[in-house]
Amino acid sequence: MIYIKKKVFNDIIFEDLCYDLEDEVGIPAAIKSRGKEGMYVDLDIRSAITKHLDSTHYPDFCKEIEALAEEFSPRHLASTISVKELEYLSYGISDHFKIHQDAGHGSLEHVRRFTSITMLSKTDDMIGGQLSVFDNDEEHVIDLQVGETVLFFSTAWHQVTAVTQGGREVLVAWVYDR
């Protein structure tokens, strides 16, 4: 299995999450594809409005993502992993993220194990903005509906095609070993 997709949150928890994010994210505080402070992001590779969030502000969300990771890969018990990074992404016209992996390089304890993407909102008229995860040369198009989450190994190649109409907002969580 290359990924797991499901509705992780009930409607009330999801609405609370969106409300909290709306307060914290505010577009003036978000940065158009500049990445973390001091980092340059090549706009040919990635274009979106981004905001890094403190995962400790969203403990219920993080617990659900950790449980989903355990369901996806039972050898990774929720007690041995934790969400350490959250990022809000808003994709508008021409925004995209070319094929890439999320697993970084470095010591094993600092390598992302899982990537999750939760669809917060998308316009009814959205064209493009398609998420694909690749298994060898096979492309798996993942049609996330609002409120759904997909989780996959951070070593999996994936991409978001350019949005040509409408837009989408997602919350990305990265899970590490504790």
Walk through the language-model features, giving the residues of each:
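Catalytic core of non-heme Fe(II) oxygenases with the double-stranded beta-helix
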Residues: P59, E66-R178
